[in-house]
Structure formats: C-alpha cells, structure tokens
Amino acid sequence: MVTFINLILGKKLGWSTVKIAASDLTDNALETTPKRLFYEIVLYSFAIEFVGAVILSFVFVPDFGALGIFEAIFLSVSAFCNAGFDLLTATPGAVGLSEYTNNPLVMITLIVLITTGGLGFIVWRNIRHYNKTKRLLLHTKLVLIMAAVMLFVGAAIIFIVEFSNQDTLGQMPVGEKILTSIFLSASSRTAGFPCFDMNDLMPFTKIIITILMFIGAAPASTAGGIKITTVALVVCTVISVLKGREDTYLMGHRIKRDAIYKTFTVIVLSLTLIAVSFTGILMCCEGMSLQKTIFEVVSAFSTTGFSVGASAEMNVPAKLIMVFTMLAGRIGPVTLMTSLIIRKNHNSDKNRILPEGNILVG
C-alpha cells in the first residue's frame, strides 16, 4: 500500500524498496523495473476483481436491484484480498453467504477469487509471461501444487467430518455439500468468509480449520499465515534428513540453506507469538475456553477473521493482545523481528572462521 501511494505521488522507487517489498520472492521474479512491477500488480488486481464483480452482479442485481452492483463489487474485492468482509448480513432481505451455498455461480466465483488472491503476484506474472519464457519458476510450481493439495485435502476432511452434521452440511444435497466444503476450505486459508456459525462445526473440523488458518496461502499474496511454501520446505527437509542427505531437494533443485533457515525461523517465531498471545489472553481472562481461545488467536495471527465468539468475551487487555497478534501476523514475524534486531552491518561474521561443533540432537 505504501509503495502504491508513492507511485501515485510520483515518487521514485529504488531496488532496495522492491527487495524489501518482495523479500519472499526469487530474484528471477524481479527482472523488470520497479514501477512497472507495481503497476502490473495493481492492474492484475483490478482486472481480476472487475471480472469477479461482473459475474456476481448476475446474481445480486436480480436479488437487490441497483444495490446488488455495490454488493458484487464489495464482495469481489473482499474475496480477492482475502479480507472476509461480507455486507450481505447487513443487506435488507439477505441473511448472508449461507443463503447462497446452493448457488454454484456465487460459490465458484468466490473460491476462484480467494484462491487467486492467495497465489501471489509472482505466480500471476510468471503464468502471464509463460508464452515468452516457456518455463515456470520453481516457486510457481510449488505454490500451484501446494494450493491444490491444501484446498482439496481440507475440503475432503470437512466433507467427511461434517457430512451428517445437521447444523452444517447435514441437510444439504451432496453437490451442495461438496461445493460448500471446498468453499470453507478455501476460506479457511485466511479469507474468513463464514457460510454458517463456526460454533456448529464438529470439534475435529475446528482443529483442521485452525491448521489451515495457521498455514495460510502463498508468499507475496493477499493471505496471511506461515505460507504454504514454508510447510513444503519443512516436509522436504524432514524427508532429506530421514534419507541421510545433507541438503534439501525439491523438484530437481537443491534448496539454499538460507531458505531452510528462514523456514524454521518463521515457524518458531510464529508458534512463539501464538503461544505468548494465547497465554496472555488466558491470564487476562479467567474461565476462557482453551479450544476457543487458540482458535481465535490463530485466526488473529493469520488475519482470517473466523470467530467462535471468544473475542466478544475478552476484556480490554486481551483485545489489545489480539490487536498486536493481528498486526504482527500481517507484517510477518520474521520481518518484524529482523527490523527490530538485526543491525545494518551484518557482514562481519562472513570473514570469521570458527571450529565446527557437534551436538547430540533427538
């Protein structure tokens, strides 16, 4: 957002700004001028949101008249940005998204918007220029595979667990159950559109949604969480260790150790932030449900917005902790900590040669 405002004001952007804004990306992704890169992001975003709004208008205009145009635009932007705001609950004559779970056009459009926003602009740009380059970046391949796996595995678990739950999927036809399960799986990775009361979900489903919220979507996207690439690298690293390899390999590539270090740093700092916030809220509010509290904290960290009602029961100090958790989760724990701790001159260690040390682990 700061970068976009600077462009509007005509200020120049240096590569240092771009590197900071796109620190999660590969160097190959930045083979363009800074200004063009950010103009492409804005253009892609508006184009996708416009198409989504037009499609949703075919449903909302007949239902709400001229107000339906605004509803379609707002919901399209909200879905693409993974914001999760839904004005349908405040619209006369509407109940909310739960009223449209039987409408494939609305559900599929929102799923596509949420998923597209969660892929990240580097993936859009790589796909758009595929005809010229004739190759996909390793980052793009990994994001597309992980996004599909997370979406459909999450949907399958939700479908199976909630199949007979009369408060959620139980009374729906099979086709609607499948589509709603996919929608809830997509929404759980930081979009936060509820299609029914989250308290009505089975306990195991809440655990799965908590995991999906914690993971989130892709780096450099509109979503939060620790990111799907982080999870993929952890899995690959564990497999490499079990196979006795010194390096981590993924799709025929050897992953840089810096990326592995950052991966585990992200997870440790994220879990630490969640644990500290969770403990702080329990200390501030006696009698809070453990399951509800951890659900709310992870939802805040990933900026998903799902709630089981625990936030309304919190006092002011606990709510301030939630605000800090949302802010830290949105900025990113690594970015936040490095900006506070790391000094500008960090090259001194590169010239130091120290003896190796062996420590027993596990």
Protein language model annotation of sequence segments:
Residues M1-G362:
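Membrane-proximal intracellular helices of multi-pass ion channels
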